[in-house]
Amino acid sequence: MAYYLNSEAHLDPGPIYVRENGQLHMVSLALDGVKNSLQKPRPFRLFPKGFSVELCMNREDDTAQKEKTDHFIFTYTREGNLRYSAKSLFSLVLGFISDNVDHIDSLIGFPEQIAEKLFSAAEARQKFTEPGAGLRALQKFTEAYGSLVLCSLCLRNRYLVVAEKLEEIKSFRELTRLDLSCCWLGDEHELLEHLTNEALSSVTQLHLKDNCLSDAGIRKMTAPVRVLKRGLENLTLLDLSCNPEITDAGIGYLFSFRKLNCLDISGTGLKDIKAVKDKLRTHIGLVHSKVPLKEFDHSNCKTEGWADQIVLQWERVSVEAVRQRKDPEPRKAAQYFYQKRALTEASRKCPLAETHMNSSGKLQFYREKAPDCHEPLLSQESKKSKKRAFEESEQEQSSPQSAKQKCVCLAVEDWDLLNSY
């Protein structure tokens, strides 16, 4: 006991109480003589002298460290002191849901304002770039909010995004503008067939410039509109330029687009251009434009909606994946075989489009505005000639030969194509 009291490391524990025979006694009073012989006790310290605080971070486990500090917001005061405050409960819940956004059952009926914040939080965490989980999460939003997620999609020259994120692109609904120029789709591409689905019946502007399309692709794209009266029935603008495999026969499939106001068929494989102009004017009222139309300069078609930044993330991921390929020789050999240029950081231009625009004039068509009611009336002779022409056309339509022609207008390939829907 004496050794303990005389120890230099002794720290005063304070008063000590002992209960004896039902009475409480202070032991320190009995040790007054001993205390007097000792040196003055040192003041009680919570930490020894020289104690310092050091902020240590375990860099090996960033996730665990993030979970510990994610509940606080660190700010600096005017004096330069670090101050932290707790996040709101809404922010904590929003962060937790965005980390597990792919496990949400449904967002139908959820407020749009909260859903937009949830979408932005998941986008900041790059949840939509994850394979599998990103697609499931994106489908939940597109099913509930449609055009709010994306109303306009521009994939011009982004053939890598189309190849890598095809299912994600197909999940978008209620698009009004879609630009797939210079994506090398071809007639048998899955995305071309997806254009005829009911989910994209809202598309009014479609750009398919330089996509290796032919008459077969145009026939497939217009089959639902021609027979079932569904699909791209609301289309008002169509760009089919720089597809040299489209001939005069393929243009005939476009007559089913009754709402079409602008059409670009420059650089196609037309032989009788004058006959095509007359047919377009007669069937759907489109007139050849002598000057380039501003609707086809691609300045108005942009990616708009909540997911506009996600498309950029997809592009960065796709380009990075191509750069990280360890064995580029097979790809270079394939590019040499197909006479394609090597990938560069800059977006790919359409050399085919430039050659066609330089070699021949543009074939762009537009719908003339209806004449104003204040314009002078037509003469009686012009009225009679129009009436006579209309009666002759009615007689031709009512004849049995014309009825037979209507029945035979669909080929066997068309019926096979329609049966596949």
From Swiss-Prot:
LRR repeats lie at residues 149-170, 174-195, 202-222, 234-255, 259-280. Residues 374-406 are annotated as: Disordered. Disulfide bonds: none annotated. The modification Phosphoserine is found at S399. Keywords: Leucine-rich repeat, Phosphoprotein, Repeat. InterPro entries: Leu-rich_rpt, LRR_dom_sf, LRRC42. Pfam families: LRR_6. Belongs to the LRRC42 family. This is Leucine-rich repeat-containing protein 42. It comes from Rattus norvegicus (Rat).
